[in-house]
Amino acid sequence: MVDFIDYIRRWVSTKASNLLGNTIMTAAIITVTCYAVQKDVFESYSATKACLFSVLMCCIWCGLFNSIALFYSERDYLLDDLDKYLPVRTYVSANFFIQFFLSAVESVVCAFVFSLFFDFSSSGYIMGNRSLDFCVTFFLITLSADMLGFLMGMLINSITSIMTIIPVILISQLLLSGCLFDLHGVMEDAANITTARWGFYALGSIADLNSLLMPGQELSIFHADPAYIMYCWRYLFLLILICSLLSGIMLYFKMNRVEN
Amino acid sequence: MRVDIKEKLYSGKPALRDIRVNFPRGKATLIIGTSGAGKSTLIKCMIGTTSYEGTVTEYNREEIAYIPQHPALNVRETAQEAIYWSALFSRLYSKDALAAEVDRYIHTMGLQSVRDNEIRRLSGGQQQRVSIAKELIRGKNIIIADEIDTGLDCGVSRDLVSKLCSITRKENKTTIIISHNIVNIELYDRVVVLVKSSSKCGGIAYAGSPKQIRSFFEVDDYVDILTRVNAADEGGRGEADYFIRKFASYRERQGKK
């Protein structure tokens, strides 16, 4: 616990400016996005769906950027510190704490900008207020993407390689979200392990997308009820947990590897 | 620290063979050698990050402080902060003693004038001194420095090595420095010359005092040692095999005595 606190203290002493930088960047991205897609949102089905999808991708991008930018900016001395005196579990838990905080701040910013641009019912499904429901969903999406980025950082050694991989991750999230077209078979199974799918379902349910459909039409994926939203949140939480644990395990093996 | 590596293979091909050498306490040893002779591989064997056939004894893995060629530092920290955090995480010092120890190592490494400067504003030599201070303050008994003077001018390099050698003697540490810089050879207590044989395998061509090295290699200038052992296609005279054999028989004679 002492190492954990000291690591956070050390991080804050030199990296706190990252918090501000990332938050400003998030605010800028979400503002531009909301401005671009604001027409007919919460009035027409397709406009709302496009808006939610755009905001979802913004959150995924911000999450990925948080961890990848941070990890590669400190990679060299961090691996040296981990080799010498910083226990892997301390680093993984401290990093999770930092990213948790960063994602929380960014989601509040996202939810604030989102509520400024769009007029939607204030009654929430889980938190009592719909802005808060959106905020929690933004948070889970951002943190989930963040942990995915962290896992990628463990798997890929160079910043050049990760820059090649990021578009692949983003495109696969984009395709597997289920927003652009219906998925079947293997694609459907693969989609179940993506942040985009569960984030999009949660956002669509909170926005009550089904109520914007023409009479007689109903999609089975958006259910504006607390149980279904919790179901989507649980999946996002599970993805966060899996990526965090895998990152820790990968890092442990990386640090204790003996080459032949 | 006693190294006895019978063989180290990379993809089935021998990279090191018959490496028997002692690194005594209180002495600074220079490991010098030709390119591809296996200096870095030898270090990896010593710090336990690669497997090999043989033994490295009379040491504890936890006692090793490894100083990399390129300082691994948080460039946003000041020199003092970098040393402070290293000391803090080592958990060796009480809260009261911590500041005094940081101060001591800042003085030892001659960093007083730049202690409050961010590391990104320091020169290569100053960054390397911070990196060394970070390791020294952790109180480890074995210091392994990997080409820490690469890219530094001769004066800075000499100052760095001189400081490290003097700390080694004063604090009774075992220091092993890999370097291509042969001009500082007289500062060390011992020298190990690692060469690449004609079969492209690393072997020892000399291990002993720097005072006798010129007569062993039959040269007047230290630089000529490397000229003699370097391969012909690298501009040398390709006599590595001869000196490996010469040293093996020299060691055998010493053993009998």
Question: Where does each model-flagged region fall?
Answer:
Chain B
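Walker B catalytic motif
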Residues: 147-149
